[in-house]
Amino acid sequence: MLEELKEEEIVNKIGGRFKLSTLIQKRLVQLNQGSRALVSVDTHDKMSIVLQEIVQDKIFLNMENEIETVDDLDAIVAASEAPELDPSDL
């Protein structure tokens, strides 16, 4: 799994080596503090879990360099969408 770190694709996906290392470090801290993995893998190696989460687009860094998950993003988008209007309410 660590071979993926050598690929430029994963570096470019995150936005550079610094952001990638920041994302990995922050996510490892979360996993060590008991956060659940966002992917199903046949390993308990936390580094492999984090890399698989990145490859599967499950986690990313927001503008404040904090970890966001796809679930967080979906909730933000849903909250920002205007509610559908019922024509009978008009």
UniProtKB/Swiss-Prot annotation:
One Pfam family cited in the UniProt record for this chain: RNA_pol_Rpb6
InterPro entries, alphabetized: DNA-dir_RNA_pol_omega, Pol_omega/Rpo6/RPB6, RPB6/omega-like_sf
GO cellular component, one term: DNA-directed RNA polymerase complex
The protein's enzyme class: transferase
GO molecular function term, any single one: DNA-directed RNA polymerase activity
Keywords attached to this entry: DNA-directed RNA polymerase, Nucleotidyltransferase, Transcription, Transferase
Keyword Transferase carried by entry: yes
The organism's place on the tree of life at top rank: Bacteria
This enzyme's EC code(s): 2.7.7.6
Reaction(s) catalysed (UniProt annotation): RNA(n) + a ribonucleoside 5'-triphosphate = RNA(n+1) + diphosphate
GO biological process: DNA-templated transcription
Stated family: Belongs to the RNA polymerase subunit omega family.
Functional description taken from the UniProt entry: Promotes RNA polymerase assembly. Latches the N- and C-terminal regions of the beta' subunit thereby facilitating its interaction with the beta and alpha subunits.
Quaternary structure note: The RNAP catalytic core consists of 2 alpha, 1 beta, 1 beta' and 1 omega subunit. When a sigma factor is associated with the core the holoenzyme is formed, which can initiate transcription.
Protein name: DNA-directed RNA polymerase subunit omega
UniProt organism field: Rhodopirellula baltica (strain DSM 10527 / NCIMB 13988 / SH1)
Gene name tied to this protein: rpoZ
